């Protein structure tokens, strides 16, 4: 087996594993969600449309190019499989983020509920969220499974590793599928804490001076994204270094 074949086999296994984790953690159900990973500079491995992500098999994943053309097809029995209907959103993320090697779209229920209720989730509450993700913005509403989804993330994904998709779910990216999955978990945990605090009427944002310290740590860890300083200053009065 060649090095490229070995890498593809490993990525297929990782997509299956992460899909099972997402289902087990209640971050999607039914046919929801989709995952992809870069095979190389020209090709992506991506999940099919219409299959349960907790029950997929390695051979049911497809290979597409960066224009969305299917290079390696797959079937479910006799039924030909198509790439996820959210393929345009995945392609847009890769175009805007050449540093990214994996994209995960999920439907975490608390995050979705709060986005429908209009509860903002970019309040600086949890130190670990600030360090790992910065602010988590919410996109404008876009019809799912359409080119609108790609347009909705276009500008935001360039500066953020995690987005909340209005009424739809989340999009997280990473250097690996595991990293993108962990960022998804962090988004849902952040939403869970926001929800609990709303019940207690006790939301208390971190002081600007403490946020500034956390942003310095984020920078030192190599996690800073373009626009971090300007965004935190504009929204929360955090003075940049």
Identify the function of each model-found stretch.
Residues 1-241:
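Glycine-rich flexible loops
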